């Protein structure tokens, strides 16, 4: 084995290095004879999810923003790949924290590979994504990556805290959480694109637009989780109720009826019973929370389209983004 006795910091005494594992100083990696096999193990849970693509909304949004930002092709490919890796890795952790059964119509990765291996795979991909981003050779990228991963975990941490303690947030606190959690990866992509591209407007305008889109996307997801039958096959029927999640419609209903513990009681059960879930949805309808949520979604979508025109400033390049927003609003 490697003998480090008597060495100073930064120095290693010469000694015997195991023939089974050699340190490659050229790229700070540890090479093994079966590295490819190791990678299959390490990436197994990630690949399980990555092989089942989602809606690819983030990739489409990156392309839409690129109409304005004109990022070099090679840099754009790196940013897209980093966002894809981070998104799927974060879903691996989300599914564990939410005890989800399904993801994209298949068993969640931790049910196939185990919780410990899935956590390790997600963390491994976080650092692979950082390594990928560093190939752009711009230290600002690492600062952006760090800031937005902190924001993502801040938002996720508050979401989990409210769920685990049965604390219903205010609407404003919920929107702040979503801006951190869901807006984080949208912002990471757009901030990196602003650095690599040629923005015609202030970077802050593009970033604000990205945050608004993230909030719109999450509230749409909250609404459809409770109302859209297509979610049943991919994620399960009204899964947010089983998770005990304070989603946007539920926050509105509880805050509108502070003396009624009905929804609190259902969330605490983490029920899988379809009949109980249907009764909860009926309660949301009676409270007007689903209609209220629809109204907020339409208002947000309008705000996004208005800001997109302001950012575009007459360039005629906003249509791709508008098309995405309009597709998101279908069947609402």
From Swiss-Prot:
Residues of the site described as Important for determining product chain length: 126
Binding site for isopentenyl diphosphate: 55, 58, 87, 104
GO MF terms held by the record: (2E,6E)-farnesyl diphosphate synthase activity; dimethylallyltranstransferase activity; geranylgeranyl diphosphate synthase activity; metal ion binding
Binding of Mg(2+) 2, residues: 94, 98
Protein family membership: Belongs to the FPP/GGPP synthase family.
Name used for this protein in its record: Geranylgeranyl pyrophosphate synthase 2
Keywords attached to this entry: Magnesium, Metal-binding, Transferase
EC number: 2.5.1.-, 2.5.1.1, 2.5.1.29, 2.5.1.10
Source organism (scientific name): Zymoseptoria tritici (strain CBS 115943 / IPO323)
Entry keyword Nucleus: no
Binding site for Mg(2+) 1: 94, 98
PROSITE patterns named among the record's database cross-references: POLYPRENYL_SYNTHASE_1 (PS00723), POLYPRENYL_SYNTHASE_2 (PS00444)
Residues at which Mg(2+) 3 binds: 221
Amino-acid positions noted as binding dimethylallyl diphosphate in the UniProt annotation, renumbered to this chain: 103, 181-182, 218, 225, 235, 245
């Amino acid at each position: 084995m490697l003998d480090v006795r008597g060495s100073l910091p930064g120095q290693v005494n010469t000694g015997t290095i195991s023939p089974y594992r050699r340190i490659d100083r050229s790229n700070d990696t540890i090479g093994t004879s079966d590295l490819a096999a190791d990678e299959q193990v390490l990436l197994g849970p990630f690949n399980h999810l990555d092989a089942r693509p989602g809606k690819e909304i983030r990739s489409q949004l990156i392309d839409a923003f690129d109409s304005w930002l004109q990022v070099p092709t090679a840099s754009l490919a790196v940013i897209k790949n980093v966002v894809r890796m981070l998104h799927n890795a974060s879903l691996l952790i989300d599914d564990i924290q939410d005890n989800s059964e399904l993801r994209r119509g298949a068993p969640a990765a931790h049910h196939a590979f185990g919780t410990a291996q899935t956590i390790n795979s997600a963390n491994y991909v976080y650092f692979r994504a950082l390594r990928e981003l560093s190939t752009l050779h711009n230290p600002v990228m690492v600062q952006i990556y760090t800031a937005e991963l902190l924001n993502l975990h801040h938002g996720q941490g508050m979401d989990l805290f409210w769920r685990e303690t049965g604390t219903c947030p205010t609407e404003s606190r919920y929107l702040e959480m979503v801006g951190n959690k869901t807006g984080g990866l949208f912002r990471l992509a757009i901030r990196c694109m602003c650095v690599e591209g040629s923005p015609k407007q202030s970077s802050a305008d593009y970033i604000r637009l990205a945050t608004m889109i993230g909030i719109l996307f999450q509230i749409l997801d909250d609404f459809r989780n409770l109302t859209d039958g297509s979610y049943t096959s991919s994620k399960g029927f009204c899964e947010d109720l089983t998770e005990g999640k304070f989603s946007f419609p539920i926050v509105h209903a509880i805050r509108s009826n502070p003396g009624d513990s009905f929804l609190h009681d259902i969330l605490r059960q983490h029920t899988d019973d379809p009949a109980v879930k249907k009764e909860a949805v009926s309660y949301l309808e009676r409270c007007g929370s689903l209609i209220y949520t629809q109204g907020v979604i339409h208002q947000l979508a309008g705000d996004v389209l208005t800001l997109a025109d302001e950012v575009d400033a007459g360039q005629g390049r906003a249509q791709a983004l508008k098309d995405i927003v309009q597709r998101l609003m279908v069947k609402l």
